[in-house]
Amino acid sequence: MAVSWIVFDLWLLTVFLGQIGGHSLFSCEPITLRMCQDLPYNTTFMPNLLNHYDQQTAALAMEPFHPMVNLDCSRDFRPFLCALYAPICMEYGRVTLPCRRLCQRAYSECSKLMEMFGVPWPEDMECSRFPDCDEPYPRLVDLNLVGDPTEGAPVAVQRDYGFWCPRELKIDPDLGYSFLHVRDCSPPCPNMYFRREELSFARYFIGLISIICLSATLFTFLTFLIDVTRFRYPERPIIFYAVCYMMVSLIFFIGFLLEDRVACNASSPAQYKASTVTQGSHNKACTMLFMVLYFFTMAGSVWWVILTITWFLAAVPKWGSEAIEKKALLFHASAWGIPGTLTIILLAMNKIEGDNISGVCFVGLYDVDALRYFVLAPLCLYVVVGVSLLLAGIISLNRVRIEIPLEKENQDKLVKFMIRIGVFSILYLVPLLVVIGCYFYEQAYRGIWETTWIQERCREYHIPCPYQVTQMSRPDLILFLMKYLMALIVGIPSIFWVGSKKTCFEWASFFHGRRKKEIVNESRQVLQEPDFAQSLLRDPNTPIIRKSRGTSTQGTSTHASSTQLAMVDDQRSKAGSVHSKVSSYHGSLHRSRDGRYTPCSYRGMEERLPHGSMSRLTDHSRHSSSHRLNEQSRHSSIRDLSNNPMTHITHGTSMNRVIEEDGTSA
């Protein structure tokens, strides 16, 4: 018997101390419950053994048992109830419970009467919970340890009870919810800080920004699909970066359409249940929104880090495009593997929370620890690594600009490329740093916001008000709007990188049902124009001006740079223009009706005339054209080819290629 009492007292002490662990004071107070007057003791403590934080709440819970007490169904029933609702107050840390035999007698003698009044026997009052003994309550040894109430103690003793979950916010224990470190509790919906009209404005604001970001990132991705070979390393990560934020903006847009149907649990007035925030993975729709949003948010940041890595490899060790592309598998494994691992960990820890402002589900909205370790820590790490590599690459490019003598045109291209990298990085880093700043501010002041909310709603929810509140504050809506704005706008800079004349030409070709044509196809198209003969009659010393079809910001490093190709084309233009145009005419000659070739159909290069203008030339013009072609084109071609030295085409690094092409694409 003694051993069982010791074991049970230890268990009860653990439970009781856990209940009042957040209370800064423990004191005895006079019993004010009408049902518990005229007992051998007159002091009690709160919260009691049934988790009633004050005597008023305990009195409300005892009301269903008044008929049984008034009808005196058992002389043990009233002492048994008071032992639970107003237990005897002894020195701190000593708690005693009624004996099991006392409970069994009260139950057997009053259970039928309780059934008549429709009052069920509470689960907290099951007799198997109490120690196996047969002694009255309170025991004589307990009466000797009764504490005296504090002199002049008021009826309602002010103590720090901590947060007590209201009945309206309680959740089924199987779901594993938690709010303000209280289990089986969830925050209220709509948001606990803002009014409905403020939430409505915020939701439409987030929806508008998500549409803008979705349009920009989708345009970037579709531009990539039109010409996949245009964007290669070191710039290929920009495309995956855009895809990630395209998915992020899509999830926010879906949240705007869903409102709070996924982020919040439905209310149940019949069970006194208010609408609460969704937590955990039991809600499949909320889980899917969380997985996509968190995964692509982290993946977008990792792809930005990989972009800085590829720029660093191209600028400092001068890696070529093919060398960087060989590491593509490692890049993809890191960019998708790290966010995937973090997402799986959060799913296993059941850290999903509904966002009743944006309508999506994320992590760290109410759990500060999850925010600190799964949002702030990764983002800060990505920023530090990315900025370090970015600065190293820019410093290397600037050293090249200063130390290596370059032509003025190449100097301007290099400066322009450095400015472009800097602007793109600033457009990404500034919004991301603002988001990180909002998260830090939120975690620093969240405790004050929660205390203010409890202070304002404690009487409405009938829960203890905060004890000795020294500071009260409510969050500003602009803080949350800024956080969502910067979290979405961070994906828009990708459109500035693909914006060029080349992009406009590709989209124009796409909408006209044409694909990009090669230079050979363009030359053949020129040969088929009806006024081509007139172009042959011009002065051969006049340089050929070709229309630009736009240039790409990408290409392979095995090709010559655009500047070198332009030099070769200019050197060959005088001799090669007549040669290519006249030689292409040879295949279009026709025989005359008597089976002979026309006089201008000799095999020699100098004696060929274009077919496209034959029908419009008179005999005089034909002979004059042939004479001028024979004399001028032959001499000019030989002179130009003999004077121009052989030009060698060299292979450049991927950074040189990007710099040169960048100068012509903007």
Swiss-Prot record:
PTM characteristics: Ubiquitinated by ZNRF3, leading to its degradation by the proteasome.
Record Pfam families: Frizzled, Fz
Gene Ontology CC: apical part of cell; apical plasma membrane; axon; cell surface; cytoplasm; dendrite; filopodium tip; glutamatergic synapse
Signal peptide (residue range): 1-22
Domain FZ: residue ranges: 23-136
Predominant subcellular localization, coarse grouping: membrane
Membrane topology annotation: Multi-pass membrane protein
Subcellular location: Membrane; Cell membrane; Cell surface; Apical cell membrane
Motif segment (Lys-Thr-X-X-X-Trp motif, mediates interaction with the PDZ domain of Dvl family members): 502-507
Sequence ranges of Basic and acidic residues compositional bias: 617-638
Disulfide-bond pairs as recorded: C28-C89, C36-C82, C73-C110, C99-C133, C103-C127
Annotated glycosylation sites: N42, N265, N356
Domain comment, as recorded: Lys-Thr-X-X-X-Trp motif interacts with the PDZ domain of Dvl (Disheveled) family members and is involved in the activation of the Wnt/beta-catenin signaling pathway.
Family: Belongs to the G-protein coupled receptor Fz/Smo family.
Biological function: Receptor for Wnt proteins. Most of frizzled receptors are coupled to the beta-catenin canonical signaling pathway, which leads to the activation of disheveled proteins, inhibition of GSK-3 kinase, nuclear accumulation of beta-catenin and activation of Wnt target genes. A second signaling pathway involving PKC and calcium fluxes has been seen for some family members, but it is not yet clear if it represents a distinct pathway or if it can be integrated in the canonical pathway, as PKC seems to be required for Wnt-mediated inactivation of GSK-3 kinase.
Protein name per its UniProtKB record: Frizzled-3
Organism whose genome encodes this protein: Mus musculus
